[in-house]
Amino acid sequence: MISEIKVRSEKEGDLLRGRDPVALAQEMAHHPIAGISVVTEPSHFGGQIGLLRAVAAAVDLPVLHKDFITTEQQIEESAAGGASAILLIAAMIDPELMIPLITKARRYSLETLVEAHSFAEVKKIEQLDFDLVGINNRDITIFEVDDTDVGRTEELARFCKGRRPLISESSIGTAGEVRRAGKSGADAVLVGTAILQATRMADILAELTSVGWPV
């Protein structure tokens, strides 16, 4: 499981509620998670590149940089900020433009997570040479305000099986949903809002990571 630090969302509003995001990341790191995702997009999610730097410096886990990354300069900023991997969104980048971004990321020893939300996007990226494939259960083009569930992963996972690990992203908040993602073919899940909104973060992290893998 990848746990996420996100300041706010268009759908849920303030997610930090006055808490220190670095302290939250350190608490997450005490649980058996694979890494931490940090959202730095400012306009819709309230992030900043300084948040990536602070979290990466504070935890001994791989850190995924999530933003609307479309330029090589942003990849350089990801590397300088301490990221281990970056997100590239198929809905926002044509394949021919994604190729130099993947090449640039590899030069900086950054893994690439390429995210799709539809069958057309899965087909669009399948021939590219990247590291991890993600299925976003929500629609990032409308800033994830849609009401969806892990059904999107169940629908698309069979088209993503192969040489790359598959990550089910968003709309996951219970052990049952983690199991559904795993049974559909996902190798991992990325969970953010549900963890940050939980009354006791330690309890939901324990619940989600207790599912084990493979499901």
Feature roles, as predicted:
Residues 52-54, 85, 179:
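Extended, folded domain segments that form the structural surfaces/walls around functional sites
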Residues 167-170, 190:
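Glycine-rich anion-binding loop/nest that anchors nucleotide
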Residues 80-97, 134-144, 184-205:
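Glycine-rich phosphate-binding active-site loops on the catalytic face of alpha/beta enzymes
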Residues 76-81, 100-104:
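Active-site-proximal loop->helix
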Residues 1-63, 70-73, 104, 109-132, ...:
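Conserved N-terminal beta1-alpha1 strand-loop-helix module at the mouth
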